[in-house]
Amino acid sequence: MTSQRTRERLIQRLYDEGLSNPQVLEVIRRTPRHLFVDEALAHRAYEDTALPIGHNQTISQPYMVARMSELLLAAGPLDKVLEIGTGSGYQTAVLSQLVERVFSVERIKVLQDRAKERLQELNLRNVVFRWGDGWEGWPALAPYNGIIVTAVATDIPQALLDQLAPGGRLVIPVGAGEVQQLMLIIREEQGFARHVLGAVRFVPLLNGPLA
């Protein structure tokens, strides 16, 4: 079930659901999602659904990975993107093929180590990893043209707003429990423009690094 045919079916479904950026769709097509899930779930890798990866975390639904990537790229190419929540490394791998450099923060060390190995196997070398608290971002390397958060925050972390470059775009799920909204925040000259894009479902963004 990891054949090219199953990948093509996934891409067609994403297109049918309104995703249209050809660059994003091509990267989703060629990125082997089955390498980012447990072997027992590999036969489900190209379903449009989130799957468990251990440690109460999930690999995001392909639709959401593609949509968040499209939102980041909507204003043009990006050279420096911060990802909060490496997780399986799948979103990281997709981003690394769409932007010049990715800086990815993960609080669960074992997940980060696995993600590093997978990206090395795929020869994706433009990603730098940090083990730490995603709420803090990565201030030492700021600012970023784009920031993507792959877990739901109860509110928008001020640290991430501070690390966004002028004109930069932050894509983040915000809320708690069953009430979560995907938001796009753009840094403008006079402040931040905030756009609510619809209901989503993500695991929570937690504080502090975890061994």
Swiss-Prot record:
Q: What family does the Swiss-Prot or TrEMBL record give for this protein?
A: Belongs to the methyltransferase superfamily. L-isoaspartyl/D-aspartyl protein methyltransferase family.
Q: Which biological process terms from the Gene Ontology are attached to this UniProt entry?
A: methylation; protein modification process; protein repair
Relate the protein's function as given in its record.
Answer: Catalyzes the methyl esterification of L-isoaspartyl residues in peptides and proteins that result from spontaneous decomposition of normal L-aspartyl and L-asparaginyl residues. It plays a role in the repair and/or degradation of damaged proteins.
NCBIfam families per UniProt: pimt, PRK00312.1
Question: Which terms in the GO cellular component ontology are assigned?
Answer: cytoplasm
Q: Where in or outside the cell? A: Cytoplasm
Statement: the UniProt record of this protein carries the keyword RNA-binding = no
Alphabetized, the UniProt keywords read: Cytoplasm, Methyltransferase, S-adenosyl-L-methionine, Transferase
The UniProt GO MF terms for this protein read: protein-L-isoaspartate (D-aspartate) O-methyltransferase activity
> Which residues constitute the catalytic centre?
S60
Name of this protein? Protein-L-isoaspartate O-methyltransferase
Give any Pfam family that matches. PCMT
